[in-house]
A protein has these predicted regions:
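Charged phosphate-binding loop/patch that engages nucleotide di/tri-phosphates or the phosphate backbone
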Residues: 17, 21-22, 44, 49-51, ...
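Juxta-kinase regulatory segment immediately upstream of eukaryotic protein kinase catalytic domains
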Residues: 1-49
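An alpha-helical support segment within catalytic cores of ATP-dependent transferases
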Residues: 134, 147-233, 243-246
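Active-site Asp-x-Gly
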Residues: 187, 225, 229-231, 236-238, ...
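ATP-binding pocket architecture of kinase catalytic cores
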Residues: 38-180
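Conserved phosphate-coordination/catalytic loops
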Residues: 52, 76-79, 209, 280, ...
Length: 310
């Protein structure tokens, strides 16, 4: 039987601490989470690999505490990721994710405290794995993906959005110049929105034009009757943590900040578009993990997404 989750079951608030988590059950001494200032005192940025004047924010690691702290000025995204980790561990205990210990905010920055995963990314280990290990890892991932898709919304309250019914956090939308997208009450509403975003350049050129009069050859290619699934939305090998030693095993799926409720086809496209074109992972193993949507859906999705780039 599939587990159901409703919004009122999610932990709420700008500052939440899970005192029943394993972090607070270590020995007899009183233990506390690091303060925001202590978090920010740790190394928090790395150089962007493709932009000389840009740095990337990385989690602060307290390895001695078995703790990683993710932080961002996108406060809703950080809190929603915390809610997601909490929900997956509670309702889908077979899916390996970091345990969440709490979150807080200070000076416009949100801090998410979670378990530090001592492993390697699948991306880093992939080329050194045997065929047997690759097959084993993919079977584990397929099982996890199937398990994730079992989570259900309340039957009378379905929506597309992040886990807390806020706008979608997917980079397909957040990496554009458009305002926040969603939430939606159906796949039809999402697809209509994607179509209007595709048509928007025509509105810029002709402000008086009605978007309904702008031709869109792709709208009818998207399946409005598609099921809504709980989705990670960024199952790139960099977000799959595996054991450092052989035999290689999946130990955690991390970085759930883009996750939420999406059409069932969404995860396939997101994995495909964020991995190296023509790579072994993309061509041979992705089809073993997720069912490829039909060609019309593929054409429409990529035509829309490619048109959204700033």
């Amino acid at each position: 039987m599939s587990p159901f989750i409703s919004l009122d079951e999610l932990p709420q608030g700008s500052s939440v601490t899970f005192y029943d988590s394993s972090f607070f059950k270590r020995g007899s001494e009183t233990i506390t989470l690091p303060t925001p200032s202590e978090v920010l005192a740790r190394p928090n940025f790395i150089q962007h690999p493709r932009a000389e004047n840009m740095k990337l924010r990385i989690p602060a690691v307290f390895q001695e505490l078995g703790l990683a702290v993710k932080h961002s000025d996108s406060t809703n995204t950080i809190i929603s990721e915390g809610q997601c980790l909490w929900a997956v561990r509670r309702f889908l205990p077979k899916v390996p994710v970091p345990e969440v210990y709490g979150w807080t905010q200070e000076n416009g920055i949100a801090f998410l405290y979670m378990e530090y995963i001592d492993g390697a990314t699948l991306k880093d280990r992939w080329d050194s794995l045997t065929v047997t290990e690759k097959e084993g890892v993919c079977q584990e991932l397929k099982t996890n993906i199937t398990e994730i898709s079992r989570l259900r919304q309340a039957p009378d309250d379905e929506f597309i959005g992040n886990i807390s019914r806020r706008p979608l956090s997917d980079m397909v939308f957040t990496g554009t110049n458009f305002p926040p997208v969603g939430p939606f009450s159906s796949a039809t509403e999402l697809h209509d929105c994607m179509s209007n975003m595709f048509k928007w350049p025509a509105k810029v050129r002709q402000p008086d034009i009605d978007l309904a009069d702008v031709l869109d050859p792709y709208r009818d290619m998207l399946p409005d009757d598609c099921a809504i699934h709980f989705t990670h939305a960024d199952l790139n090998p960099v977000n799959i943590m595996v054991s450092k030693d052989s035999p290689c095993r999946v130990i955690a799926i991390i970085d759930w900040e883009q996750s939420g409720w999406y059409p069932a086809y969404w995860d396939f496209f997101k994995v495909e578009m964020t991995t190296k074109p023509g790579s072994e992972w993309q061509t041979e193993y992705l089809p073993k993990l997720l069912k490829e949507p039909d060609p019309d859906c593929c054409e429409a999705f990529y035509s829309y997404v490619n048109s959204y780039a700033p």
